[in-house]
A protein has these predicted regions:
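Feature recognizes metal-dependent phosphohydrolase scaffolds
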Residues: 1-657
Length: 657
């Protein structure tokens, strides 16, 4: 066999890890065994909007996968009430275990029964994984015993006796609680191989920061950014406009816990400024939306702060629009179109009276200019966002594990829309002198979003990238926005409902056509009946009969209303998607009451499941992206074995096994 210099150089590098024929052959055999296993389960969630309790419950339950496995393994011999208790124990072991223990008359017997049930369940869940993979999922401090309990063979000894003796030792030495908790964590870890979050972790919900903590602890997760995410990314990067934008949403819902409690960002200077500047203003239009889960506090103070940041946001929007003609947002720099003496705004050729004419910080001769006090507030907030270590860790995680879109195992994942023309062609959007559409546009947006955080501080490239992050939040042709405008100004200042309409991109009309879904998949290099688009962003109005399944089954929108504010609009509390070795399952969830009720009343989220794609045969690891990479490694290892055997590369010294 002839070897190119480059191929030989690569094989020599590979030989450093696999130093003998035996080592390379053993790895080939191990990989071939792995490739024959069923593919792991993938779990898709979208549009979490800060609803951390519902998110954590669905994450812990794997969208009902764990309860299904409990019913499969224990359904014949264990009452439904006890299966529900076991499910809650697995979801919330640290909280549920003390409650269950307190109820027991014979704690020793309960420990034994619970450990045996968890062993059976864990053996079942681990059956589609190699033993090596399962071992790597086990905690170090008790991994050996867990491995023995999961993989013991009973040809030579009695199963009940073997388990019984180990369990007796665990109970005798007061380790039962620790082993129960470890089994629960391992079951959750093995039930789902990979988690996909299709955008919008942030928004009005109480604690998006806690969602990110959970994601950072997850074993394998990827994120497709949503419009609410990129504006927080811009805020963390140092964009004053993105900061005012996230503050406006936060104050509109009186959700200061995320900023002050979660990220340690003080709003005291802003509060003092707002209380002084708008002391005599009517702020009734600026009162926060009610949410019983957020601290009430001084609602009038919150309203003044809400108005203060909105005015600063409008000024900064006008500045960004002026320095970015590419954005094509002229006309949305509203402060430049207000007649302050008359109290009216020229809205794209129509004059409207303003609902609020009080602008004490605006200079009619230069309406986009911040006052000296506003400049100080903006500078302090930029510094506070930059110095929040937790926020910076979270945003770095979003950049490291996130992207504008992802292709995984034949599926295409993105949050918003692929901009289209009225006739269904990909819309060409011009930035920096070049028109881009489809995949090229997505790749460009990904690069510019990263530029806003990673370009050198103070550089023109970083400033331009931060402006672009804001554009992605609300721009008329932003794939993450997918609408003609974000009508924040219109809803606050103009009474006419016609001005408040946000027109959806033609994409949302065309995705009903299977040809559109197939066209998008081809644009990203995907094809075949097993390829699907997983989309978020726009709540599906299930209550009105709308289906989340579009394009002849090729596109699935999984935003069904995680956000509590959308429950009345959608009639449900969200969709999740499960992709296992047999196909794609869409789960429709009803509203989640609370973690407290789930723990103490074993109340699970009511869900219904629907197979939307059934694979013609069971999907194996060899059929996945990882399988393709493993098969490429087998080819390389086979070439290495041949190089050893032909004397082209010398074998190393065999290591003792």
């Amino acid at each position: 066999m002839q070897y190119s210099d480059e191929h030989l150089r690569y094989l020599r590098l590979l030989s450093q890890k696999y130093q003998t024929v035996a080592a390379a052959a053993s790895e080939i055999i191990r990989i071939e065994a792995l490739l024959r296993l069923p593919k792991g389960t993938e779990h898709f969630m979208s549009d979490l909007h800060g609803e951390h309790e519902a998110f954590v419950h669905i994450l812990n339950s794997a969208s009902g996968v764990i309860r299904e496995k409990i019913d499969t393994v224990l359904g014949n011999g264990v009452p439904a009430e006890e299966r529900a208790e076991l499910a809650t124990l697995i979801y919330y072991p640290n909280q549920k275990l003390p409650e269950l223990k307190a109820r027991q008359k014979d704690l020793h017997a309960w420990y034994r029964m619970t450990l045996l049930r968890l062993i059976d369940l864990c053996r079942f869940v681990s059956s589609k994984h190699t033993r090596d993979h399962v071992r790597r999922c086990l905690p170090q401090n008790c991994g050996y015993i867990l491995d023995e309990l999961l993989h013991a063979h009973f040809e030579d000894h009695d199963k009940d006796q073997y388990y019984g003796e180990i369990i007796e030792s665990i109970i005798r030495y007061d380790r039962a609680d620790a082993y129960i908790i470890r089994f629960c964590e391992v079951i959750k870890r093995l039930a789902v191989d990979r988690l996909h979050i299709v955008g919008d972790l942030f928004d009005r919900g109480p604690r998006p920061d806690r969602i990110l903590d959970s994601l950072m602890a997850h074993h394998q997760v990827d994120i497709q950014w949503g419009n609410h995410d990129v504006v927080w990314m811009g805020a963390a990067a140092g964009s004053p406009l993105c900061i005012m934008t996230v503050l406006k949403t936060t104050l509109a819902y009186n959700n200061l816990d995320t900023l002050e409690g979660g990220y340690g960002i003080s709003l005291r200077r802003l509060e003092r400024f707002a209380q002084h500047t708008y002391a005599d203003s009517d702020v009734s239009r600026w009162l926060p939306h009610a949410d019983q889960r957020t601290a009430a506090g001084d609602l009038t103070a919150a309203a003044r702060m809400h108005k203060a940041v909105t005015v600063m946001m409008l000024k900064l929007e006008a500045q960004v629009i002026a320095r970015n003609p590419d954005f094509d947002l002229q006309g949305r720099d509203f402060l430049n179109h207000i007649d302050f003496a008359a109290g009216t705004v020229d809205y794209f050729g129509t004059t409207y009276p303003l609902l609020d004419c009080d602008f004490p910080t605006v200079d009619p001769a230069n309406p986009a200019a911040l006052t000296a006090d506003e400049e100080k507030i903006a500078a302090e907030l930029v510094r506070s966002f930059a110095e929040s270590e937790r926020l910076q860790r979270h945003v770095q995680f979003l950049y490291a594990h996130g992207a504008f879109y992802k292709m995984c195992n034949g599926n295409l994942l993105y949050h918003g829309a692929v901009p289209m023309t009225e006739d269904g062609a990909f819309a060409a959007i011009r930035f920096e002198g070049t028109a881009r559409s489809g995949k090229q546009l997505f790749d460009y947006c990904d690069r510019r979003a990263r530029q806003g955080y990673s370009a050198p501080a103070g550089s023109p490239a970083r400033l331009a990238g931060q402006d672009f992050l804001w554009y992605l939040w609300c721009g008329a042709k932003s794939p993450l926005s997918g609408r003609s405008a974000m009508t924040t100004f219109e809803r606050l200042y103009i009474a006419d409902p016609a001005a408040q309409v946000e027109i959806k991109d033609p994409y949302y009309r065309h995705i009903a056509d299977p040809r559109t879904a197939e066209h998008i998949l081809r644009e990203f290099g995907l094809s075949g009946e097993g390829s699907h688009i997983v989309n978020g962003h726009v709540p599906v109005r299930a209550i009105e009969g709308e289906s989340p399944i579009k394009g002849g089954g090729r596109l699935i929108i999984i935003d069904g209303g995680f956000c509590r504010a959308y429950h009345r609009r959608t009639g449900i509390a969200g969709y999740t998607l499960v992709y296992n070795s047999r196909g794609l399952i869409l789960r429709t969830h009803q509203p989640f009451e609370s973690v407290d009720k789930a723990i103490h009343e074993d109340e699970d989220i009511a869900s219904k499941s629907e197979y939307i794609y059934t694979a013609p045969q069971r999907i194996l690891v060899r059929d996945t992206d990882e399988g393709g990479r493993k098969q490429a490694l087998i080819r390389d290892l086979t070439a290495l074995v041949e190089a050893y055997q032909s004397g082209v590369i010398a074998q190393g010294v065999a290591q003792e096994m």
